[in-house]
C-alpha cells in the first residue's frame, strides 16, 4: 500500500490462514518441586523447550513470561529454570492472549496438585500455606521479566481471593456433601481451584494530549492503538472524571501518528494502565490550568471551585460560574499582551512509563462433569475472582473476563494444531480444528471483584488476559478429580475428548 500509494485488499481462505498465521503455547517441561512434610514449597526446578516456529520475531518474551509466572502467587525461595528456544518448521510463535503465562501457571499448579495428593493435604490448604503475604510487597523475585528488568510484583493480597473463590464455589460443601452423593449416583463430577498472577501494564511508555476546545468539548489524542478493548469508553471516563464533563463530550483519537507521534502499542494488558495513566496525567494538568484561569476570572480561590457539567463554579454559589468553552476562549487571547511564560490554550501533553508492571491476580474455581462414554465435558459452575486494581468500568472488565475464559476453555480442551512427523499441518480447517461454542461455555460465569490498588496514580492493573491464564491448570485439576477412580495424572494441555480417552486407555494398559 505504501509503495503503490493506494489501499490494498488482501484475501485468504481459511486454510491459507491456518498455514500462514501464528501459533503459541507449545512447550515441553521437565519440572520438579521440593516440599516439606507440611506442604511448604522448598524449591522449584524446571527445564523446558519452547517452540518458536520457523523464526523468532519476539525474542524471549514468551519463555520469560513462562518463567516468571511459574512461581505464581507463591513464596519460592529456591528457583531455577533453564529454557531452550527451539526452531521448528511450524508457523512462527507470537504472543497470544496469555502469552506464555498459562504454561507457567500450569506447571506450578500441577506440581502443587501432585504434592497435595502425595501428602494428603487439602488442595486449597496447600496453596494457602504458600501464598505470599500482603506485607511482602513490592516483592522482587530476583529474576528477569519480559522487559529484561527485574520481575517485581508491586502489590498483592492473595489469600482473600483464594478464600472468596472457595466460598463462592462452595468448595468444602461440594467435597463433603454434594460430590459423594453425585458419585453414588454414578456421575463423574470434579472440582478445581487455581490461583494465578498476571503481569500487566509493562513499559516502556505511552503518551496523551488533552485539549479543551472553545466549544467546551474535550479532544484526546494518544499513540496507543485499539482493537476493540473498549479503550474509547475507559479513556473517556478517566478524562471526564478529571474535567467534570460527560463522556459524550469527549472525542478520542488513538493510534494516529498524524495526531500523536509517540506510542508503543496495545499488548500485555497495558492499555488502561499505561495509556490510561498518561491520559490521567495530561487531564490533571489541564484541570490545574482550568482552575487557575477560572480563579482569576471568577475572583475566587482555586480551592473553592469545582468542575461539574462542563462548568467551573463556586462551590457554595453555583450560579457564579463559567463554562469550559468560555475559559478555552479566554486562554487563547488573539490580541493584547500576556505575562512572559504564559502558555496559550487549555492543553497538556503527558507521558507515563512505569518502573515495573502492575501485577494482577485472582483465583478461578470450577465444577464439571465428565461423560465416561464420550469424554465430553459439561461445566456446571464457574467462579472467577479477579483483582485488577481499581475497576474503571465493571462492564468492560467483566467482558474481558468472559472473553478470556472462553479462550482459556479452548486452550484447555479443544484447540490444538496437529502436525505429522514432517511438520505438515493436518487440521487446517474449522471442520477439524475444535473451538468452543456457546454450548461448551458455562451456563453462567460468577465473577467476584477485589480491588487492591497498584502503585500507579490510577491504581489500575490490566485484565485483558486474566480470564485465560488459569484455565488449563484448572481443567486438569477438575478432570482428575472427576475421574478419581481412574488414578490418572494429566501432564499436558490442550486435551480433547479423544485425547482424554487415549490417556485413560494408556493408564488401563499399564
Predicted segments, located by residue:
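Cofactor-binding beta-sheet edge motifs in enzyme active sites
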Residues: 1-160, 167, 172-510
Amino acid at each position: 500500500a505504501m509503495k503503490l500509494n493506494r489501499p490494498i485488499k488482501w484475501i485468504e481462505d481459511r486454510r491459507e490462514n491456518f498455514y500462514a498465521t501464528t501459533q503459541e503455547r507449545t512447550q515441553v517441561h521437565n519440572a520438579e518441586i521440593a516440599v516439606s512434610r507440611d506442604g511448604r514449597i522448598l524449591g522449584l526446578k524446571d527445564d523446558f523447550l519452547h517452540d518458536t516456529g520457523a523464526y523468532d520475531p519476539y525474542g524471549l518474551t514468551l519463555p520469560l513470561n513462562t518463567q516468571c509466572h511459574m512461581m505464581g502467587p507463591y513464596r519460592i525461595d529456591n528457583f531455577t529454570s533453564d529454557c531452550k528456544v527451539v526452531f521448528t518448521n511450524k508457523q512462527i510463535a507470537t504472543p497470544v492472549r496469555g502469552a506464555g503465562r498459562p504454561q507457567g501457571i500450569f506447571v506450578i499448579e500441577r506440581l502443587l496438585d501432585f504434592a497435595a495428593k502425595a501428602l494428603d493435604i487439602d488442595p486449597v490448604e496447600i496453596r494457602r500455606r504458600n501464598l505470599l503475604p500482603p506485607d511482602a510487597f513490592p516483592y522482587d523475585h530476583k529474576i528477569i521479566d519480559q522487559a529484561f528488568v527485574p520481575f517485581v510484583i508491586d502489590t498483592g493480597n492473595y489469600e482473600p481471593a483464594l478464600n472468596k473463590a472457595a466460598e463462592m464455589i462452595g468448595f468444602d460443601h461440594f467435597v463433603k456433601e454434594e460430590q459423594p452423593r453425585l458419585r453414588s449416583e454414578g456421575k463423574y463430577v470434579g472440582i478445581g481451584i487455581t490461583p494465578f498472577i498476571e503481569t500487566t501494564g509493562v513499559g516502556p511508555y505511552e503518551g496523551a494530549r488533552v485539549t479543551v476546545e472553545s466549544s467546551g468539548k474535550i479532544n484526546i489524542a494518544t499513540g496507543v492503538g485499539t482493537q476493540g478493548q473498549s479503550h474509547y469508553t475507559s479513556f473517556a471516563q478517566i478524562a471526564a472524571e478529571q474535567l467534570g464533563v460527560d463522556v459524550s463530550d469527549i472525542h478520542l483519537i488513538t493510534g494516529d501518528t498524524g495526531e500523536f507521534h509517540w506510542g508503543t502499542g496495545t499488548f500485555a494488558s497495558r492499555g488502561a494502565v499505561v495509556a490510561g495513566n498518561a491520559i490521567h496525567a495530561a487531564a490533571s494538568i489541564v484541570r490545574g490550568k482550568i482552575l487557575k484561569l477560572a480563579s482569576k476570572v471568577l475572583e475566587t480561590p482555586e480551592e473553592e471551585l469545582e468542575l461539574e457539567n462542563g462548568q467551573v463554579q463556586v462551590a457554595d454559589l453555583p450560579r457564579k460560574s463559567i463554562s469550559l468553552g468560555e475559559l478555552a476562549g479566554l486562554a487563547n487571547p488573539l490580541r493584547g499582551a500576556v505575562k512572559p511564560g504564559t502558555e496559550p490554550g487549555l492543553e497538556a501533553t503527558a507521558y507515563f512509563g512505569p518502573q515495573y508492571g502492575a501485577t494482577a491476580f485472582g483465583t478461578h474455581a470450577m465444577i464439571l462433569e465428565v461423560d465416561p462414554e464420550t469424554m465430553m465435558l459439561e461445566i456446571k459452575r464457574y467462579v472467577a475472582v479477579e483483582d485488577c486494581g481499581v475497576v474503571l468500568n465493571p462492564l468492560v472488565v467483566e467482558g474481558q473476563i468472559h472473553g478470556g475464559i472462553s479462550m482459556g476453555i479452548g486452550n484447555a480442551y479443544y484447540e490444538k494444531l496437529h502436525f505429522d512427523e514432517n511438520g505438515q499441518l493436518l487440521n487446517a480447517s474449522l471442520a477439524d480444528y475444535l473451538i468452543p461454542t456457546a454450548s461448551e461455555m458455562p451456563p453462567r460465569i460468577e465473577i467476584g471483584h477485589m480491588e487492591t490498588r497498584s502503585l500507579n496514580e490510577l491504581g489500575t492493573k490490566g485484565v485483558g488476559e486474566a480470564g485465560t491464564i488459569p484455565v488449563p491448570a484448572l481443567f486438569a485439576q477438575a478432570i482428575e478429580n472427576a475421574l478419581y477412580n481412574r488414578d490418572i495424572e494429566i501432564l499436558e494441555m490442550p486435551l480433547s475428548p479423544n485425547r482424554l480417552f487415549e490417556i485413560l486407555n494408556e493408564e488401563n494398559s499399564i
